Amino acid sequence: MKIVSIEVFATELPLLRPFIVAYDAFHELPSIIVKMTTDTGIVGYGEGMPDPHVTGETFYSTYEMLSRDVAPLLLGENPFDIEKIHKIMSAAVYHAPSAKAAIDIACFDVMGKATGQPVYNLLGGKVHSSLSVPYVISILPPEEMASQAADAVKAGYTSIKIKVGDDPATDVKRIRAVREAIGTTIQLRVDANQGWRNVATTMRVLKQVEDCEMEWIEQPVLADDIIGLAEVRQKTTIPVMIDEGLHGDKEMREVIMRQAADLINIKLMKCGGIYPACKLVAQAEMAGMGCQIGSMVESSIATAAGAHLSIAKSMIFSNEMVGPLMFSRDFGVLTYEKNELLVMDAPGLGVDVNEATVRELSVQSTLIQ
């Protein structure tokens, strides 16, 4: 089997409502879609969701990199040779994880379709019976966040994740308001997205909310301050999760060496796809660290990829693959029942991609063959 063409689409996905985090506010999200065709006629789809604040890539840089620097080198390669393909990509471009993730995911979609297996069977088989997801609330006034959280609990959610990080004093009010609104039996996750920046600010906030029984605090300090994150972990009783500070093997080694986090948030867009994510899971298992599969608010394509990985690995205890719930348009359909994402058992990713929608939402596309 050989890759005979790769088509790259630069698309924009409309959100149901603005999504506000510590570093930006989004009204639509850029997504790079890859359509990979083989000489056997099998077609696989992949997705890259770049973010300058997280992956160091922009929408158009990712599109151009895939179109000019990566895709042409992969023509004639076998999608099953996934390690070789990653080596080719790494030799061609440094870092660029979401660009590489788009190719990686398309390869796994092809492999699953070629073997007649869902991707999770290529990763070890189904180890979890279901995938539960939290209700995610972006940065808003405390009373609005509390109201959304209460409504989510009434709708059947058992875990609430809130975004904070734009103002420490208001963040304390947000955390307290949401905890009061949802009671003590619902899990509460707090994500600062680097917004508290340093140890001093982080500890000032955490000392005021330690009684709020948070499941964890995620990435409170700047991404490259792993030493600072380790200090936070030493000074608080709240479990600490690293997100933006963890991309690949280099950061993982330092996190383990410095005992900088209790938990890790793996995102396919940060590490380069399913194949490198499996390596991070193995390292986390060696270090005894629990894993979450997070999301860059991706479409059904990359969300499905994360779901297949999550359901196949015992060390992955948490999932935040909620992107499809946040878009008014999508390229495919994933099924959610209350707080559960239903597993896709069809071959490949299990997503029936609507190519007409991909083309309609594209602002630019190119075919490499």
Which ranges hold each PLM region?
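Conserved, mostly hydrophobic/aromatic
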Residues: 3, 34, 41, 70, ...
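Shared catalytic-loop signature of beta/alpha-barrel
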Residues: 207, 213, 224-241, 246-340
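Flexible C-terminal active-site loop/helix
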Residues: 4-15, 26, 31, 297-369
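Metal- or metallocofactor-binding catalytic centers and their adjacent structured scaffolds
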Residues: 5, 37-114
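Hydrophobic faces of well-ordered beta-strands that scaffold small-molecule active sites
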Residues: 46, 131-137, 160-162, 188-192, ...
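Glycine-rich, aromatic-flanked loop segments that form ligand/cofactor-binding clefts
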Residues: 105-137
